[in-house]
Amino acid sequence: MQKPVCLVVAMTPKRGIGINNGLPWPHLTTDFKHFSRVTKTTPEEASRLNGWLPRKFAKTGDSGLPSPSVGKRFNAVVMGRKTWESMPRKFRPLVDRLNIVVSSSLKEEDIAAEKPQAEGQQRVRVCASLPAALSLLEEEYKDSVDQIFVVGGAGLYEAALSLGVASHLYITRVAREFPCDVFFPAFPGDDILSNKSTAAQAAAPAESVFVPFCPELGREKDNEATYRPIFISKTFSDNGVPYDFVVLEKRRKTDDAATAEPSNAMSSLTSTRETTPVHGLQAPSSAAAIAPVLAWMDEEDRKKREQKELIRAVPHVHFRGHEEFQYLDLIADIINNGRTMDDRTGVGVISKFGCTMRYSLDQAFPLLTTKRVFWKGVLEELLWFIRGDTNANHLSEKGVKIWDKNVTREFLDSRNLPHREVGDIGPGYGFQWRHFGAAYKDMHTDYTGQGVDQLKNVIQMLRTNPTDRRMLMTAWNPAALDEMALPPCHLLCQFYVNDQKELSCIMYQRSCDVGLGVPFNIASYSLLTLMVAHVCNLKPKEFIHFMGNTHVYTNHVEALKEQLRREPRPFPIVNILNKERIKEIDDFTAEDFEVVGYVPHGRIQMEMAV
């Protein structure tokens, strides 16, 4: 039975993979480590690595794996001539792997003459086509090669897909677009990259690698096949480029998405040679396919991952390293296990009490991707809070109408505030941040110098005594609650600086609208942490979200079920511009921020409960 082929590739949302025979993006350190480990690691070696899953991947470029020598099993990497020649001479051949170059012009003796063959390294082979390379592997390396990885270029990728031999795709999703002149071919399932793939198809290279079908392998193009993700990592970033890693598995379009239970897949990780058939191929199981990646990434809580639920977010993704899965799994948990109750709005909720999420800020920014988050609204509202502004009309005039329904004449009257003008939220949020305890008159009054400026005090403590355990800011003022249009939902935050001068923020939220509000709140306090870190000369580290009454409105359930079917994409990066000008928290403007690499799924309509 023919060995399957796995494709390893890094690409932009529009499937760009190269330009001028090189990479379009700057050096991505973790991607290089990922490529090395995936293509070097055999199933046996992965199973021996610290009982499968080390807590941290190695800090150096060394894989820590034994070099395959003659008599030991190893993996093969197959590449086109241009890919081979694009690698610096000192890095070729790729060590600890059998290298096969597909070319009609190169000769094995020419490659061998480049430099002496290292001890234990297999000699580089040259074949005229991908089918010829696969035949060579089957005939001469049947008992020594474990897995076959095609690593470029575009023509070989297209040949593997057309031949129907590609069982798994190892994709690095580069979230930013770069100018490209070479593109990965379109494939069923490429919406994992973006909402609509629009890249023009690059012509296949002149080398004879593209074959629409291959009678000698008995394989024809399978129009009923698609690729779906079984692994999504957390987001990494290097040189201002956010990216993550996904593994896609070949499936028939008619297959039930929940056929492969996560518990079965994870239990098979302890098997060293387990394989399952994929369309007539001897393909690795889902677990075996992701084993090389699992071998260097942090382990998620296995019991949580294996738990069977009535509703589950993208259940075919077995390894859920992307931090957005916290949010998606929270939605599913509430719908499955929450209590249905009445609420103030009259809509009704399904709720749980006491939930937590953690989001890293040192690599990327947690702007959720399974639906588009209103970034302008997040930014403008936070700046509004920081100014201590209580006039919601100022937001509405900028197109941010998130407060409009809570400051109408009817709503203010229902709060026993008939004396308030439309748009006046009262002494809430930003007023308490900057003027805690001051007597509130109306949204037009200048409160400079009145009350306690909590935000200023926190920043001063971070600058002068960063180990202080009293760096808190609260919007909850019991004496003023009846004067507010809405009592604050997110009401307390605390800051912490570690010994590496990294800043983290904890926020406690008493009332959490998971469908509409929580994605906004995650982004808002993450952004606040970035801003405070900048003016205090610290590095952002983590945002921790503590949630009290955590609920899904009953009229959001169907929309959220749609969201649970969407795979997360890489988180973006948020850059602060004009850094030299910004010395104090009040110096920030909306023009000082740049979001890089945000490629979310489309919007999902949900009505706000008032």
Curated annotation (Swiss-Prot):
Any single Gene Ontology cellular-component annotation: cytosol
Family: In the N-terminal section; belongs to the dihydrofolate reductase family. In the C-terminal section; belongs to the thymidylate synthase family.
Transmembrane segments: none
Domain DHFR: 4-250
Ranges for region Thymidylate synthase: 322-610
Binding site for substrate: V8, D31, Y157, T172
Active site as annotated: C489
Sample GO molecular function, one term: thymidylate synthase activity
Sites where the protein binds NADP(+): 10, 16-22, 81-83, 102-105, 152-159
InterPro entries the record matches: DHFR-like_dom_sf, DHFR-TS, DHFR_CS, DHFR_dom, Thymidate_synth/dCMP_Mease, Thymidate_synth/dCMP_Mease_dom, Thymidate_synth/dCMP_Mease_sf, Thymidylate_synthase
Record field: compositional bias (Polar residues): 261-275
Oxidoreductase recorded as keyword: yes
Species annotation: Toxoplasma gondii
Record: residues binding dUMP: R344, H490, Q509, R510, S511, C512, D513, N521, H551, V552, Y553
Protein name: Bifunctional dihydrofolate reductase-thymidylate synthase
